[in-house]
Amino acid sequence: MQEYLEKRYALALYEIAEKNNKVDEYLRDLTDICDIFDENKEFYEVINHPKINTAKKKQLFTDLFKGKIDEELLSFMMILIEKDRILQLREILDQMEKIDLERRNTIRGIVKTVVPLLDEELEQLKAIFEKKYEKNILFDTKIDKSLLGGVYVKVGNDIIDGTIKSKVEEMKELMLKKE
């Protein structure tokens, strides 16, 4: 039930953002606000405190964000406060990002390497997966020294693990089976 509501809120906000041609702005602002929740324990406690009434919470948000975020986004936040759903903002943002990717015919992938890939190498990987999925691919690249070498790629349900670490583990398993 909770996820259903989060999707509905996300879709409603996405449609407003899309109508106003501010999808990227809303996503960026929501991310920043969620980061404030995550990084500022006192702020989170005030928002979560049952004895602080809705009017005070709304005033706090107005004081903090009026003039810094779009008025319609601020109004949306007021609705979340009224409905006691402001603490689900991260989940609503996650759903909104999924909607955005879907509307842009895009999926996310992860590329892990020991050293950064050259732009050309990343573009080659991207082209391979875009052809396979017939979607745009957005890769999150991560440096992971524990891989020892090679590359790890995950897109959708596909995983390509060409890392030295995985090869060593495979050899270790083979050697242990033979004993």
UniProtKB/Swiss-Prot annotation:
Native organism: Clostridium beijerinckii (strain ATCC 51743 / NCIMB 8052) (Clostridium acetobutylicum)
Membrane topology: Peripheral membrane protein
Protein task: F(1)F(0) ATP synthase produces ATP from ADP in the presence of a proton or sodium gradient. F-type ATPases consist of two structural domains, F(1) containing the extramembraneous catalytic core and F(0) containing the membrane proton channel, linked together by a central stalk and a peripheral stalk. During catalysis, ATP synthesis in the catalytic domain of F(1) is coupled via a rotary mechanism of the central stalk subunits to proton translocation.
Gene3D superfamilies per record: N-terminal domain of the delta subunit of the F1F0-ATP synthase
NCBIfam families (alphabetical): ATP_synt_delta, PRK05758.2-4
Family membership: Belongs to the ATPase delta chain family.
Self-association state and partner proteins as the record states: F-type ATPases have 2 components, F(1) - the catalytic core - and F(0) - the membrane proton channel. F(1) has five subunits: alpha(3), beta(3), gamma(1), delta(1), epsilon(1). F(0) has three main subunits: a(1), b(2) and c(10-14). The alpha and beta chains form an alternating ring which encloses part of the gamma chain. F(1) is attached to F(0) by a central stalk formed by the gamma and epsilon chains, while a peripheral stalk is formed by the delta and b chains.
GO molecular function annotation: proton-transporting ATP synthase activity, rotational mechanism
Localization: Cell membrane
PANTHER family attached to this UniProt entry: ATP SYNTHASE DELTA CHAIN
One CC-aspect GO term: proton-transporting ATP synthase complex
HAMAP family, per database record: ATP_synth_delta_bact
UniProt-listed InterPro entries: ATP_synth_OSCP/delta_N_sf, ATPase_OSCP/d_CS, ATPase_OSCP/dsu
Keywords associated with the record: ATP synthesis, Cell membrane, CF(1), Hydrogen ion transport, Ion transport, Membrane, Transport
Protein name: ATP synthase subunit delta
